Structure formats: C-alpha cells, structure tokens
C-alpha cells in the first residue's frame, strides 16, 4: 500500500512509518554535530516520549553527548484494522533501534502514564534492568484528559479565556484557509479541570512515587516544559485556562525542588519557544503569531525547532559548565529568550497586523508551519520514497 497524508482540520489521520524514521534520524544527526551535553545524566525517564519536546529530549540526551540510557512512556497506537497507527508509535520504534545500534538502552512503555499499574511496571524495570536509579525525569505529557486517580472519572482540559471571549484567526491545515474562531469564557469547573490535566499535580505524583520506591539517584533532576509567550498572546494563553495550568506547573516545580533538595536534587520548568507541535496547533488564534514569529526568526537565522531547543537546554542550561542552573526571577529556565528579544517581537508585532486570510500563505511562514506539521507525521521529508509500496504485514512485525 502507498500511505498518503490525511488531515482533518488540524488533526493528522495518517502517519508514514519510514518518514517518521527519517525524522528521528534527522534529529539524531543534528545533535551529533551540535554543542554536546557534558556532565549529563546517564539514566533518564521521559514521560511523554513519543513526539515533540519529549522525543527531542530523549534524542538529545541519548545522542547529543550524554550517551544516556532512556525509558520512554507514551500512549500510542500501532497498526491495526483501523489504520497504520500513530506517528509516535513509529518514533518510539525507530528511536529504540537507533539507541540499541549505539549501544544504549531505549526501552519503550506503551500505555497510560496516569495509571498505578504503569508506574509499577516502570519502577520494576528500573530496579531489575535499568541499574536501579534515575539521574533525570523529564515530564512532557501532552494530553486533553486525565483520570481522577481516586474515582476514575475523567478531567478534561479546555482552551478558553478567563475573561471576555476572544475572537481571532486560526488556521485550517486541511483546507489551507484562515478562519475566525471565538474562544469562550471558561467556567470555574473548566478552569479547575484544565489545571488538573495540564498543571503539575501528576508530575508531582510521579516524582513522589519514584522517590518512595527509592529509584531517584542522589542529585537527580526533573524538568517539565511550559510556554509563556509575549503580550500579543496573553489573552489566549497567559490569561486563559492554559496559563492558569502552567502557573500551577511552575508552582509545582518550586515544591518539588524543596523536596528533592534534601537528596541533592533539583526541579525546574523550562519555558520553551512557540513551535508547531501536535498540541500547539489546537490553540485557537495562536497560529498567526507562529506564522509571523517563524518568518522573523528564520530571516534572522535564529529559528529553532524542538530538537534545537532541547539540545540548547541540556547542553547550556541544565548540564554542562553551569554549576548553578541559570534561571529568571521566577526560577524558570528560559530557552524562549531568543523569541522574546525586543527587536524580534517588534518585527513580529508589525507583521502580525499585516497578515490576513487572503495573504497569510505568503506574508507569514505558512509553508514552514505546514511543513513542520506534516513532518510531525512523517510526510514531506527528503530521502523518503513516498511512492514506495509498504507491506502492512511488515509494519505489524515492528516491535515497540
């Protein structure tokens, strides 16, 4: 069979397995030639390891200098009668293959990271086959739902404002059109539920569970990822349900840092730049900002994707020559620093007001935006024969 891209709105309904393989290899090739991670961790757990920042973290730490053994947890779907499976499924497989070829452990756990059963499986594996202790825990779970650990009822996140409704343009990748979308005002319950799903509660619970099991090494670090952005995005992000959840995440880092300091450990949130990820394309009215930002940063030669961001985080912030991790006044690591430089934001603001539904494909970097989205799912990568006939049976034999 020949696998074609299928996009519905901003959701990819298909993935190209060997395009995903190429994307993983491209990221590995980048970190192998970048400034290396020195004095880095050797045993790493990545929660949410199959795409975006989680996958990039795993690649950076394994191949970007530290030569870390990694465990990745993700909720992905393999090939079945419903289709070829998700991009993350293949990212996991091909990462593991590359890691093992390099003499590293790249263990994948496929399932629900929120369940006690998954935690126990991971802890058992750490104790019996992974050397017993972790040097770093990366928390990069991006999901819209989380079960209440006591009742099993689902909390569902909402991307809404906490003030007046906001109307703004958003992009439909399926139709290559820009459409107006209104973001409504969240109810108190929606605000609370979003905090439960996207805040720091589950991160803290994981760290507590791992600590109680005795699998955190002395000096272990943990990091989660966040976004703050410029004032131009505040109404939809910073001052909305997402911003409230991220504030909870930031506060959680401080609480975890206090706990982990007793064993020489540290906990941080790294604030990253705006990027095209499976999660970010869902944020209404956010895409015009990304179109303008990408164009300006590429023109200036300072654009970064997930892998560049993570390599810079681990080589220049969390590890390396810094004996003290550089943070801002709120104890946040800032790798959004280039995005927020004054001259870049000035140019982005000037460009945003010029972007319209008629000209967005040329005025902003829509080609780059769409290419990033397609590449998340294994399409549009050089070196891949997209006309090749792929045997479905072969895909079912690939082992995660």
From Swiss-Prot:
Protein name, UniProt field: Enoyl-[acyl-carrier-protein] reductase [NADH] 2
- Entry binding sites for NAD(+): 48-53, 75-76, 112-113, 141-142, 246, 275-277
User: Per the UniProt record, which EC number(s) apply here?
Assistant: 1.3.1.9
Q: Where, by residue number, is the active site?
A: 237
Q: Does the keyword Transmembrane helix apply?
A: no
Q: Where is this site: Plays an important role in discriminating NADH against NADPH?
A: 76
Q: Name one GO molecular function term.
A: enoyl-[acyl-carrier-protein] reductase (NADH) activity
| Listed HAMAP family | FabV_reductase
């Amino acid at each position: 069979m020949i696998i074609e891209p299928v996009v519905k709105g901003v959701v990819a309904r298909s993935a190209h397995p060997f395009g995903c393989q190429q994307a993983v290899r491209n990221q590995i090739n980048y970190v192998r030639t970048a400034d290396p991670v020195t004095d880095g961790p050797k045993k790493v757990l990545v929660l949410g390891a199959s795409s975006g920042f989680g996958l990039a973290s795993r690649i950076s730490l394994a191949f970007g200098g530290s030569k870390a053994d990694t465990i990745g947890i993700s909720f992905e779907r393999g090939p079945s009668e419903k289709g070829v499976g998700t991009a993350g499924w293949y990212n996991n497989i091909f990462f593991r293959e590359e890691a093992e070829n390099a003499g590293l452990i790249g263990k994948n756990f496929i399932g629900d990271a929120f369940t006690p059963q998954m935690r126990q499986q991971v802890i058992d594996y750490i104790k019996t086959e992974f050397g017993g202790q972790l040097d770093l825990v990366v928390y990069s779970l991006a999901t819209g739902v989380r079960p209440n650990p006591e009742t099993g009822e689902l909390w569902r996140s909402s991307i809404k404002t906490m003030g007046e409704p906001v109307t703004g343009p958003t992009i439909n990748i399926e139709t290559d059109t820009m459409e107006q979308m209104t973001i409504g005002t969240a109810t108190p319950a929606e605000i609370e539920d979003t905090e439960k799903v996207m805040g720091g509660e589950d991160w803290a619970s994981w760290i507590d569970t791992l600590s109680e099991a005795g699998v955190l090494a002395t000096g272990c670090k943990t990091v989660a990822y966040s976004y703050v952005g410029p004032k131009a995005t505040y109404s939809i992000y910073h001052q909305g349900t997402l911003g409230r959840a991220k504030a909870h995440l930031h506060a959680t880092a401080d609480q975890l840092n206090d706990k982990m300091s007793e064993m020489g450990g540290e906990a941080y949130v790294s604030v990253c730049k705006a990027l095209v990820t499976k999660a970010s394309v869902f944020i209404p009215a956010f895409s015009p900002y990304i179109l303008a930002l990408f164009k300006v940063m590429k023109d200036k030669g300072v654009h970064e994707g997930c892998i560049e961001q993570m390599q810079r985080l681990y080589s220049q912030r969390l590890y390396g020559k810094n004996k003290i991790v550089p943070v801002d006044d709120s104890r946040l690591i800032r790798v959004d620093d280039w995005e927020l430089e004054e001259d870049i934001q000035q140019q982005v603001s000037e460009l945003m007001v010029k972007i319209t539904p008629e000209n967005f494909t040329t005025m902003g970097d829509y080609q780059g935006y769409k290419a990033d989205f397609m590449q998340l799912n294994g399409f549009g990568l050089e070196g891949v024969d997209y006309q090749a006939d792929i045997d479905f049976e072969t895909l079912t034999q690939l082992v995660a």
